[in-house]
Amino acid sequence: ISSQHLCGSHLVEALNLVCGDRGFFYNPRGIVEQCCHRPCSMFELENYCN
């Protein structure tokens, strides 16, 4: 899966998809820096799952 820029609702949707029932903790500064300003992978998104 290629890395991509994810911002706003797209970022939340991707986290829901990756984390599923585990849920995720939302730290806007960290994840926006990592996934919106720069492209990030699904593996990087998993770091935000509970």
Curated annotation (Swiss-Prot):
UniProt keyword list: Carbohydrate metabolism, Disulfide bond, Glucose metabolism, Hormone, Secreted
GO MF terms, alphabetically ordered: hormone activity
Disulfide bonds: C7-C36, C19-C49, C35-C40
Keyword Disulfide bond recorded: yes
Location in or out of the cell: Secreted
Pfam families: Insulin
This protein's GO CC annotations: extracellular space
GO biological process entries: glucose metabolic process
Principal location listed in the UniProt entry: secreted
Quaternary context: Heterodimer of a B chain and an A chain linked by two disulfide bonds.
Annotated family: Belongs to the insulin family.
Function, in words: Insulin decreases blood glucose concentration. It increases cell permeability to monosaccharides, amino acids and fatty acids. It accelerates glycolysis, the pentose phosphate cycle, and glycogen synthesis in liver.
Identification of the protein by name: Insulin-1
